[in-house]
Amino acid sequence: MTEEIKFSVLVSLFNWIQKSKTSSQKRSKFRKFLDTYCKPSDYFVAVRLIIPSLDRERGSYGLKESVLATCLIDALGISRDAPDAVRLLNWRKGGTAKAGANAGNFSLIAAEVLQRRQGMASGGLTIKELNDLLDRLASSENRAEKTLVLSTLIQKTNAQEMKWVIRIILKDLKLGMSEKSIFQEFHPDAEDLFNVTCDLKLVCEKLRDRHQRHKRQDIEVGKAVRPQLAMRIGDVNAAWKKLHGKDVVAECKFDGDRIQIHKNGTDIHYFSRNFLDHSEYAHAMSDLIVQNILVDKCILDGEMLVWDTSLNRFAEFGSNQEIAKAAREGLDSHKQLCYVAFDVLYVGDTSVIHQSLKERHELLKKVVKPLKGRLEVLVPEGGLNVHRPSGEPSWSIVVHAAADVERFFKETVENRDEGIVLKDLESKWEPGDRSGKWMKLKPEYIRAGADLDVLIIGGYYGSGRRGGEVAQFLVALADRAEANVYPRRFMSFCRVGTGLSDDELNTVVSKLKPYFRKNEHPKKAPPSFYQVTNHSKERPDVWIDSPEKSIILSITSDIRTIRSEVFVAPYSLRFPRIDKVRYDKPWHECLDVQAFVELVNSSNGTTQKQKESESTQDNPKVNKSSKRGEKKNVSLVPSQFIQTDVSDIKGKTSIFSNMIFYFVNVPRSHSLETFHKMVVENGGKFSMNLNNSVTHCIAAESSGIKYQAAKRQRDVIHFSWVLDCCSRNKMLPLLPKYFLHLTDASRTKLQDDIDEFSDSYYWDLDLEGLKQVLSNAKQSEDSKSIDYYKKKLCPEKRWSCLLSCCVYFYPYSQTLSTEEEALLGIMAKRLMLEVLMAGGKVSNNLAHASHLVVLAMAEEPLDFTLVSKSFSEMEKRLLLKKRLHVVSSHWLEESLQREEKLCEDVYTLRPKYMEESDTEESDKSEHDTTEVASQGSAQTKEPASSKIAITSSRGRSNTRAVKRGRSSTNSLQRVQRRRGKQPSKISGDETEESDASEEKVSTRLSDIAEETDSFGEAQRNSSRGKCAKRGKSRVGQTQRVQRSRRGKKAAKIGGDESDENDELDGNNNVSADAEEGNAAGRSVENEETREPDIAKYTESQQRDNTVAVEEALQDSRNAKTEMDMKEKLQIHEDPLQAMLMKMFPIPSQKTTETSNRTTGEYRKANVSGECESSEKRKLDAETDNTSVNAGAESDVVPPLVKKKKVSYRDVAGELLKDW
């Protein structure tokens, strides 16, 4: 088995291949390894380690050199300050004391560090074990897990083996053998099969026999295909010579992500050129793709771009991921993803790559339905050309001569696009082909950019061949100084390293090396001469100690500039290259930032030269050979010294009279000259510099050096104010919406003219102004405040009848057709809107809902069991909660029709037995946690005059009761498991929400009286369709069960008690009998913490109550004894019982047998004995009057010991007296 091969064998193969000089030797050793050690059925386990960059079965490791160095340091257990740790972290840097000869090669430096800790003996790691560990490494979600895997690898390998493991992780073995050579040696058809499947495992499994040719496989939907590529060409004439005599189409080369879209029904994949599936595009694009691609199966080849709706054009490259993330998070933006399809590879069930490009263009127009700004088609006739803005060039044309190509290329470059692609219309689509059927022409290939003189201020160490020495430079532009003064500040501009030969680079480095200063960020700041961002991508390894010691470089780039976030300069360059080293130029003559910005603005955001010699493109070789000997005839005159020519401008109005404008920056949609002419047309003047005569500073955005300078001196106004004034031909007031920056003086003055929402006291609002004011008003997030104002401001019932409802909609579509499901969806949308209009809320979270409304067609029967099957186990438990009403849509329809919230019981879908089982479980639990007191009969209703006012200061916390309690052997109690730090639940109807709220004592007193319980099933108010009204006493009430307190919260009184009773303030624990007119149904339990009754009752009432309660308890015990053997006991000391036992010493206690209850209930111990006065407690005279009654009846099975009745009337007085 290949899996059992030691990894050391594969390491030997790597070493042999790396040492071999010729390609044939490398290939023969690879072939010998396969024939000797590998079985055909197990090729993949070894090949995936030889070319790891093509293995897509294993996910990304998420480890580059810097992170991998940190993980290795942790895995080895060495300090970050140790020399070996510093070498790993600074692997790029040179110096024999640190990195040595291996500087720039991370795997070799890691091997040196590991060699002193691992030794040379192999750990016996097999290929299978290595693959398993690499799978674990790829699936690890945090650095700690990755470190653990690396530690295991270190234990099972030696330093030489670990070096190759690190290279496999970095997916760069540096064997000097291309994947093309490996495929050719593995099987003659391997490369072709991989190009159409991008599946290395499939290649290894299908091509086991090297001598058996494989039938050429066509592309399939769902499997990535290597894209056809364009050959680079540097000259229009050279490109035309290769395509002469053929039908050629010229297309704009878009600057985006090359993406293949695979559609199979509703299953959409977005494969990149590296055959990675970019699922991040799915949220923004998948629905659009499904609706606008008119076939079920299809493969499109195209470019994913960003469309700017405000500018009506494509945005600059680099924001795809940002826009995809914004769409995924539901953020509004004026930018959106747009896919431009320029080829189709698969239609229906057939591959069309063998058809000509012209035929594929016709298919593309039939298959894709274009949607402006979202899904476009790039074809010569129609498609994207139809949607282009007026005045802009076409995106795709058929060319017939080199002049047509030249003209199209210039138009594309002026439009700031990436370049053009020339395609043979008769060519077929070839996966991975770069033979010249497609050719690309980009501006940097023909030196269309201007040469810029910049100053070196820092350096970066290289890797690989240039490891250990500075190979790239950080260059800067000067901040313009005053006349006849050298610049004192330099702003970071870009990073450049290509363009020089090794000798030229070594010469520059040797001249600067004496002035290198190590960058010790963050310990030491950069030299004060340099203005930098300290961005990680900007931060150099070394600084140039002083600008006077530095050298000027002449650099060129793509003609397009990009707005910089990494560097201080407002613009940076794309693909910069060093043209030559300017030893002849002193350091202070480098280009300044202001001149560069004006150059960019004057050339519409590019660095294009004003006039390019035609011979440059006709004969690029001559230009290249003579570029160093001849001085370029390029003039970079700062445009701020050149006034806009306004001699032919005629005045239209005088709205800007006596005003002088200075434009800090302008939008891309307008040029600086346009604004200058606009100001002059309306009677104003403009200045090219910011001086004291300027009255208005205008800007398009709050960024850039010029903006920072302007805002230090005066207010900065948005350019839209100028446009609005000109469009309306009148001077508009400077409202807050027009300001980009306000000085302190202007801000103070403006506060007298506007309110807190920026609404002016003196000017009327238009529609746009009203929208702005409303957007400035903060929205309240307090739901209670919102409900209060809704009731106050919308007193009509139709706007507030569902104010307290939160509705969760469930579509019941068990046997519906597609059309009926669509109608059900429309019904759901209508009801959602009506709920919102009626003041209710709609939620997608069942835990937040108060009503689950089941939507169904009129004739469809509803089944609660089928409804519950659609939910998770946690949600099923919520469905049984009484607080959640499961109703049909008729309840909602009729409530909306009558403009009032109807009782839910009539419309409930939850079967009564399910609802009762939920409440019944609560009753059983409470029944078992209740030990019947000697006085337990149902009490008659107290008159209103018996209400006793007790302040909240008398309330005792549960903690205090526990401290005063005394442990007892009879106080066995069955309790539910606690969840975290939450108290155990006593009743099944109790909810999590009830544990978190508190209310005033008056609310608690009224709620306790209203929610009394009864033990008898016949006495439970469960009639359907009638809602019990709060505030009314119930008829035929029996003993009341009171639950133990939780912390400072009031105890819950019964299983049917509403959830509102859980929200009582625990500090106000007063007697429930103190309520007005709600004293019925009270009893006291030995184990529960409750306040004693204060009202006095006659002895005859007590005897009647005792008989009734004991009869109910006896019947309940006899009926449930056989089911009560399922749960374990947990000994729990009841606070009130312990307190009573401490107050009344018991001469003798009789242990009672406990009876097991049904699952989920509590076990209770019956306590017998007499309660006498305690000498230790020194009670007052009322304690001596405590009555001791006869014992209770005993249970039948198991027998219960009779217990004596204890009157708690006097005990209550004693307890309250202590308080």
Curated annotation (Swiss-Prot):
A molecular-function term among this protein's GO annotations: DNA ligase (ATP) activity
Protein name, as recorded: DNA ligase 4
Record's compositionally biased regions (Polar residues): 932-960, 1148-1159
Catalytic activity: ATP + (deoxyribonucleotide)n-3'-hydroxyl + 5'-phospho-(deoxyribonucleotide)m = (deoxyribonucleotide)n+m + AMP + diphosphate
EC number: 6.5.1.1
Domain BRCT: 651-739, 807-909
PROSITE patterns: BRCT, DNA_LIGASE_A1, DNA_LIGASE_A2, DNA_LIGASE_A3
GO cellular component: nucleus; plasmodesma
Sequence similarity: Belongs to the ATP-dependent DNA ligase family.
Cofactors demanded by this protein: Mg(2+)
Residue ranges of the region described as Disordered: 604-632, 914-1126, 1146-1197
Species: Arabidopsis thaliana (Mouse-ear cress)
Enzyme class, broadest EC rank: ligase
